[in-house]
Amino acid sequence: MARVVETSGTRITFRRLLRRPRYRYMIVNRIVPHLPWFVLFALASYLYKARIFADSGFYVSQFINNQTFWIECQRIVLGISQIIPLIGVWIGLQIKYILLLYSLSHVIFFYILFLFVYYGLRDRRSGLLIILAQTVGIMHSFYTPMFELYYGVPLLITFYSIWRLQFRFRTIYILLILEVLILLSHPLAFMLFVFLLLYDFRKETAKPFKYYAAVGIVFIAAVAFKYFVMCGYESGKLAWQFNYTENTQYLQLINPAYYKVLGLFMLRYYSEVLIAFILVIFMLANRKQWFRLLVVAGTFFAYVFLVNSAYTVSPSRYMEQVMFPFVPIVFIPLIYGFPASGRQGLLNISVLLISALIAYRLAVIYYGSEIFVKRIAQMEQLIETARQKGGSKFVVSQDVIDHGYTQLNWSFPIETMLLSAIDGNDITVTIAPEDDLYFENNNNKMAADQFIFRRWELKDEKWLNSRYFHLDIGPYRTLNDTTPNTNISSIANRMRINIDAKKIYRATDTVWIPVTIINQSDIPVYSGKNNKVFLSYFWTENKDVLNWDEIRTPLQADISGTMRQDIRVAIPPNKGHLQLKVDILVNDKWLGIYSLEDVLVY
C-alpha cells in the first residue's frame, strides 16, 4: 500500500513525476498491477462491436456524422473518449477501426490516470482504486463505457491523490481543473465531491484555509453554472425526483416486504459493496473516528433513499449506472483506511483479497458478455437478410425477434447502421423496431429522405457522413411480411437447414443454437406475426424419436435466399450420442425440411 506522504521532500515536481519509484518487490510491482489493464484492453478489443450499446452508440454516431466533438448537458468529460476515434474520422480510417479505437480509448484514458497516480504520485492505493472503479459494480455497463460517472470517479480519485500530498499553492490550479471536470461530469459528482472532502477533513491534516476557499469558490460557481444552464434532461429528472406528489416511488420504502427485495438484490449483485461497507463501519468504529463514520454511513443510507425513491431495483445496464456511486462511497474509505505500514503479512493478505476481487469482477464482465455477443450476432443476421431484400431502411417485429438477449431498445436503429457500415457505406442498412416506426405517427410524418435515428428523433439522410453511410431514399420496408404463405408446402423440398450446434451439451440444459435456412425457390417464406411460422426441432436416438419439451422459436425474418438465426432448444435428459433435427412449422404442420446434426449429451 502507498504511504501517506506528508514531508516536504514529496512535493509534486516535474522531475519527481519522471523518476521511477522504488517499491518493494520491484518485479511484482512492474508486472502485476498492469495485468487487469491488459485484460481490459483485450476485452475492449474483442467486444468492440458490443460496446456501442445504447448511449454509447448514440455518441459514436454523433461524432462520426458531425465530424466534431458531441457534448450534451455540459458533461465535458464525454469529449475525452472521442479524441482518438475522432482523429480517425478526420484522417478517413475505416469505420471498423474507428469503432475499435472508440472501445479502446476509454481503457487508454483510465490506464493513463492509473500510471500517473501509481508511478507519478507514488500512490498505489489510488492506483488500486482506479482499477476497482473500472471493475466493481460493472457488467452490463461495460458495453456503455461512456457513462460520465465512470470518468468522474477516477478523476475524483486522482484529485484526492494529489490533495493528500503537500504541495505549493500554485498546484491548486491543477486541482481546480480536475474539480471542474469532476463536477461537470454528472450531477451525482457534486455529492461524491462533498463526501470525499468531508471524509478527508481532520484537524491534524487540514490544509490552509486558502486551499479550501479556492475549491469552495469553484464548487459554488459550478453549482450556479449548472443551475442556469442545466439541460432539459437533467432538469426534468431532478424535478420529477423531488416532486413527491407525482413521484410516489418512495412509498415502497415504507413497505417492509420491499426491504427483502432490496436485500436480496444487494446480496446477489452487490455483495462486495455490502462486505466493504461492513468492513469500513467496523474499521472506523474500532478507531473511534466517529465523524468519518457518520459521513460514510450517512452518505450511504442517504443514497439508498435517493435510489429507491426513484427506482425499483432490477439488474440492468441503467440500474448499474444508478448504483455505481456506492462503489466510491465504500471503497475509498476502505482502501485509504488500510495503514500504509504495519504487519507485512496483513498487508499482503489485504492486497491478495483486493486482487482476487478484481479478478472476479473481470471474470463477471467476460461471462456477462455472452448476451451481448449473441445480440450483435442477431443484428448481423438481420442485416444480412435485409440486404437480400434490397433497400436500406427496414422495420422488424419485436414480437418475433425478441430472444431475451435481443434488448430491443431505442438505440437499435443506430447500432444496426453502425454495424452494417463496417462492410461498406454503399450497403449500409438501418433496422428499427415496428414500435419506433409508429411512435407518435412517425410513419406518416417522415419524409422519403429521412430515417429513424431514435424513435423520438428523425434525421435527414444528408446529415450522414457520406464517407461511412449511405441510405436510399424511400419508405421503410418490413423484414416480417404478413403475406400469407399459401404455397409453402410446395417449396419444402427446395429448402435446407444447416445446424451449427456444438458437439457436446449438458442434459436438461436449454440453449440457443445457430441455424442457417436456405430457400432455393423463387417463393419467399413470410414471417409476419400472424403467419404462425416457427422453427422447432426433435431429438432422435438410434432413429427412435424421443419425448421432448418442444420449444417454438418464431422465424425472425422472411426467407428469400439465406437466413441465419438462433433457435431455442431444450436438451433432453437422455445421455449419449443423439441426433438433432430442426424443421419449420407453419400453422402447426411440419414442412419436413432435411436437417440432421449429431450431438453428444452428457
Q: Where do the model's predicted regions map?
A:
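Start-transfer (signal-anchor) and selected internal transmembrane alpha helices
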Residues: 1-41, 337, 341-342, 579
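Transmembrane catalytic cores of multi-pass membrane glycosyltransferases
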Residues: 40-106, 111, 139-149, 180-281, ...
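Transmembrane-helix motifs of polytopic, lipid-linked glycan transferases
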Residues: 104-124
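Transmembrane-helix signature of polytopic, membrane-embedded enzymes
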Residues: 117-137
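Membrane-interface transmembrane helices that cradle and orient dolichyl/undecaprenyl
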Residues: 156-172
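Signature aromatic-anchored transmembrane alpha helix within multi-pass, membrane-resident enzymes
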Residues: 288-300, 337-362
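Hydrophobic/aromatic-rich transmembrane helices and adjacent perimembrane loops
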Residues: 311-342
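Membrane-embedded, lumen/periplasm-facing catalytic core of multi-pass transferases
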Residues: 354-428, 434, 452, 491
